[in-house]
C-alpha cells in the first residue's frame, strides 16, 4: 500500500535534507537531548523494502530517519510529519520502526539484535482530540515491552518561543496557527495587515540571524521558500491572504538565489551525509531481501539519480 505525499511532506523532507542542522533543536526539544549542533547527521534511506505474503516486494517510505553521531556515541531517530492525527498512524510507526531496526540488525551466535529508533511525530494541526503522547506496546512470549512516541504540536509554539529555542524548522508551518482566521483576514484589510506585520517580524528576525552568522544564506532562502510553498497550498482559497503574506516573505526566493548558492558549492554535507547513507541502505537492504545484483544497481541509479559506474562503486563498497 502506498501513501500519497502532500506538499507538507515535501516541505518537511526538503528542510530535513537541505538544512539538516535545523532538526537538532527539535530533537533537543522533544527528546530532552543537549546536542550542540556540531554533531554529524547521517541519513538512512527513506525507502524500506519488505517481502509481502503474496511474494511481491513491498516498499514503505518514511518522512525521515537518521543517526546523530556525537563522538563515539550514536542514536537513531525517526520523524514523521502529519497534518493531523489518523487511526493508522501508530501502525505505520511500528511498521517503519521495525524495518529501520531490521535494516541494521545483527545476528551473533544465533541471537538477532535490533535497535528501534527514537521516534516522534510533528503535528501541523491539533485539536482537543490530538494526543499529547503516544505509545507502542509489544506483547512477546518473553514479556511485554513498550516505547514512547513523543508528540510535537507546531501550533503550540509562538514566534518568540520559536526563535528563543532555535526552532526555525517550524517557521514554514507557522501559518497553520492562523488557518482558522483565513476568512476573517481575507475580508478585512486591517486584520490582514496585522498578519503581514507578524510575518514582517519573522523575516526581520531571520535576517538578523543571517547577519549574526547563525544561519547561512541558503538556510534563510530555504526557510522563506518553504514557507511560501506551505502558504500557497493552505491558503489557496484565500487569495488576499496568500498574496499578502507572499508579498512580505519575498516570493519564490529559492528558484534563483538559493539554488545559485547551492550550485556554487554550498552543499552543507548533503552528498557526504545523505547520498552515502542512502546508497549504503539501498545496497544492504537489497542484499538482505535477496535482490539480484542488477536489481540493486537499478535501484541505486533510479533512487539516487546516478550513473551505472557510480552505482557499481557504491555496490562494491557496501555489497556482499
Question: Which residues fall in each region the model found?
Answer:
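Accessory alpha/beta interaction modules
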Residues: 1-169, 174
Amino acid at each position: 500500500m502506498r501513501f500519497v505525499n502532500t506538499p507538507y511532506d515535501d516541505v518537511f523532507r526538503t528542510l530535513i535534507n537541505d538544512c539538516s542542522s535545523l532538526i537538532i533543536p527539535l530533537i533537543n526539544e522533544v527528546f530532552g537531548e543537549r546536542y550542540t549542533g556540531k554533531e554529524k547527521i547521517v541519513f538512512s534511506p527513506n525507502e524500506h523494502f519488505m517481502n509481502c505474503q503474496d511474494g511481491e516486494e513491498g516498499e514503505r517510505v518514511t518522512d525521515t530517519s537518521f543517526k546523530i553521531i556525537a563522538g563515539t556515541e550514536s542514536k537513531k531517530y525517526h520523524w514523521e510529519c502529519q497534518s493531523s492525527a489518523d487511526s493508522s498512524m501508530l501502525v505505520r510507526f511500528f511498521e517503519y520502526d521495525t524495518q529501520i531496526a531490521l535494516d541494521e540488525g545483527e545476528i551473533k551466535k544465533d541471537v538477532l539484535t535490533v535497535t528501534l529508533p527514537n521516534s516522534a511525530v510533528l503535528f501541523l494541526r491539533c485539536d482537543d482530540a490530538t494526543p499529547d503522547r503516544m505509545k507502542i506496546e509489544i506483547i512477546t512470549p518473553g514479556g511485554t515491552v513498550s516505547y514512547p512516541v513523543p508528540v510535537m504540536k507546531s501550533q503550540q509554539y509562538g514566534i518568540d518561543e520559536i526563535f528563543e529555542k532555535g526552532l526555525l524548522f517550524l517557521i514554514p508551518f507557522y501559518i497553520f496557527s492562523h488557518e482558522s482566521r483565513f476568512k476573517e483576514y481575507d475580508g478585512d484589510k486591517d486584520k490582514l495587515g496585522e498578519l503581514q506585520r507578524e510575518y514582517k517580524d519573522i523575516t526581520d528576525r531571520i535576517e538578523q540571524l543571517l547577519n549574526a552568522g547563525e544561519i547561512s544564506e541558503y538556510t534563510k532562502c530555504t526557510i522563506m521558500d518553504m514557507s511560501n510553498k506551505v502558504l500557497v497550498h493552505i491558503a489557496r482559497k484565500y487569495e488576499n491572504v496568500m498574496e499578502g503574506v507572499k508579498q512580505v516573505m519575498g516570493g519564490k526566493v529559492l528558484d534563483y538565489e538559493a539554488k545559485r548558492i547551492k550550485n556554487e558549492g554550498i552543499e552543507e554535507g548533503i552528498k557526504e551525509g545523505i547520498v552515502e547513507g542512502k546508497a549504503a541502505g539501498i545496497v544492504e537492504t537489497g542484499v538482505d531481501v535477496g535482490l539480484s545484483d542488477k536489481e540493486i544497481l537499478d535501484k541505486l541509479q533510479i533512487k539516487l539519480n546516478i550513473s551505472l559506474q557510480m552505482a557499481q562503486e557504491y555496490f562494491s563498497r557496501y555489497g556482499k
